[in-house]
Structures are given as C-alpha cells and as structure tokens.
C-alpha cells in the first residue's frame, strides 16, 4: 500500500490565524439553536484549520436580542437564579421579567454555558457582542459580514 501524501495534520499557530466578524440576527430564532451556532463560531470550529488549543475563533455581533424566542412552555417555566452573597440572598427571575430587563443577558448566559470553562474559553467569549435592537453602527470598523443562521 502506498502512503497518501495529503494526510498531514496541520497545527495552526495563533500568529497564522485571521479574525473576521459576523452579524447574526436573533429575531425569531430559537435561543438554544442560535446559541450553539454562535458558540461554534466563537470557538473557531467552523474553520477547516480548527486547532483546539489556539484562540482562532471569529467575532460575533448578535442583533435584535429582545426578539429571540423559546419553544414549548419554557417561556413560563424558565427561571434565572443568582446569589447576592447575603443570607437568604437567592434571587429568582422568570424568563419574561429577565427579557424585559436584560435581553442581552439571556443570550450571553446561553452561549456562555456552551463555551469551555477555561482561560481560552473566557478569551473567546470576549469576541461576543450582543445588541438590543437592529443597530450595529458602533461595530462598522470591524467590517462585519451578515450571517444567516
């Protein structure tokens, strides 16, 4: 048997990577499906040259954060919890209240749960921008590409 010559594994260095920015519209999209696709882009898994230990992911700008949706009865059942640090300080906020107060947090929380809990994961998460509304003029210098998910 002759050995194939195109089966070499390439390890990409961080200096060899290029970072591009994408705009994702969350209007009418399901929260989990949107979050998993965005997490994949942030990690760089959509690239052919994906290397797990290199921060090679792209940046993502999510617009229309307040128009994301949940399926089934989760709209009335989903609860966000946090602890204030004081005795009896456990706070619970239903999805609908959180959507009215902080729609950006809902998407950020979902994407953060899909990222690795390491230093690299935190670095990759810094490339995420979530915007309420459909205006992203503040990020025009990144020359973002509209991505349909």
From Swiss-Prot:
The keyword Manganese does not apply. One of its GO terms (cellular component) is cytosolic large ribosomal subunit. It comes from the Bacteria. One of its GO terms (molecular function) is mRNA binding. The keyword Protease does not apply. Keywords: Ribonucleoprotein, Ribosomal protein. InterPro entries: Ribosomal_uL13, Ribosomal_uL13_bac-type, Ribosomal_uL13_sf. This protein is one of the early assembly proteins of the 50S ribosomal subunit, although it is not seen to bind rRNA by itself. It is important during the early stages of 50S assembly. This is Large ribosomal subunit protein uL13. It comes from Chlamydia pneumoniae. The lineage of its organism: Bacteria, Pseudomonadati, Chlamydiota, Chlamydiia, Chlamydiales. The gene is rplM.
